[in-house]
Amino acid sequence: MTKFRGCIDIHSGQVKQIVGGTLTQDDSASSKTSSAKENFVSTKPSSHYAQLYKDYNVKGCHVIKLGSNPANDDAAKLALSTWPHNLQVGGGINLDNAQYWLDQGASHVILTSWLFTKNEQDKMELDFGKLREISKLIGKEKLIVDLSCRTVIENGKTNWYVAMNKWQTITDTILSAEFLLKVSAYCDEFLIHAADVEGLCKGIDEKLVENLGEWCPVGFEEKIVYAGGAKSINDLDTVAKLSKGKVDLTYGSSLDIFSGKLVNFTDLVEWNKANSKTN
């Protein structure tokens, strides 16, 4: 059954909520300015949010490092140490550091840009050689593939192309049932941000959610996490209906714990309890 999942997005060492399409540059220590539109910048440490998810038993939450600033690593480690082996971590994960982050207490590592390489047409596409290698190294049960995407309308048809590099680079990889089935052989979950609506609080991409439910590989029910645009607790009911309970939903900027005015965290917790056989 569909459930609410939490997030902790970290940028320049702080927990933030950012409009997805505006994250155009890295937050390295040498970068003095940022073009990112920030909906929320927390004065609290990442551990505050990790403790909140722990206290209310919100399972499967992800910690995302939005840039290479070393302070992001410190904040991610602080969150992981607050609830060891229960939070997922992503951002800059590769073959060399995946096991390190598991050792730091992550339940899973989330793969994003590293998975993609240029093809013969000089376009980026998912590299199954890399995916197989890292899956073999750490085990598919510890691996999540981030397939966040942007909407592209071609000849009147809507496609969702996987986007990398802070969602600024559109790859040659298109989401489909066949593609998700192929990737699912090497990982435990999918994380899919709808980058065009991320952080806007103007509604979810309902057609994408519906398609994800239809495309869901056997055994991946409740292992696809959608993020982007959630603005009401009713979005959980919508996602449950559209995906037939197969897709989970993340809330960010609309949530009161991130100074949002639209959704109460405790209401989402209660929704999970009322709609889950395991809670």
Swiss-Prot record:
Give a single Pfam family match.
His_biosynth
* Any GO BP: L-histidine biosynthetic process
What EC number(s) would the UniProt record show? 5.3.1.16
Where it sits in the cell: the answer is: Cytoplasm
| GO function terms (MF aspect) | 1-(5-phosphoribosyl)-5-[(5-phosphoribosylamino)methylideneamino]imidazole-4-carboxamide isomerase activity
Q: Which UniProt keywords apply?
A: Amino-acid biosynthesis, Cytoplasm, Histidine biosynthesis, Isomerase
Q: Which reaction does it catalyse?
A: 1-(5-phospho-beta-D-ribosyl)-5-[(5-phospho-beta-D-ribosylamino)methylideneamino]imidazole-4-carboxamide = 5-[(5-phospho-1-deoxy-D-ribulos-1-ylimino)methylamino]-1-(5-phospho-beta-D-ribosyl)imidazole-4-carboxamide
Naming one, the record's GO cellular component terms include: cytoplasm
Q: Its pathway? A: Amino-acid biosynthesis; L-histidine biosynthesis; L-histidine from 5-phospho-alpha-D-ribose 1-diphosphate: step 4/9
Q: Mind telling me which InterPro entries this protein's record contains?
A: Aldolase_TIM (IPR013785), His6-like_euk (IPR011858), His_biosynth (IPR006062), Isoase_HisA-like (IPR044524), RibuloseP-bd_barrel (IPR011060)
State the family it belongs to.
Belongs to the HisA/HisF family.
NCBIfam families, alphabetized:
hisA_euk
What protein am I looking at?
1-(5-phosphoribosyl)-5-[(5-phosphoribosylamino)methylideneamino] imidazole-4-carboxamide isomerase
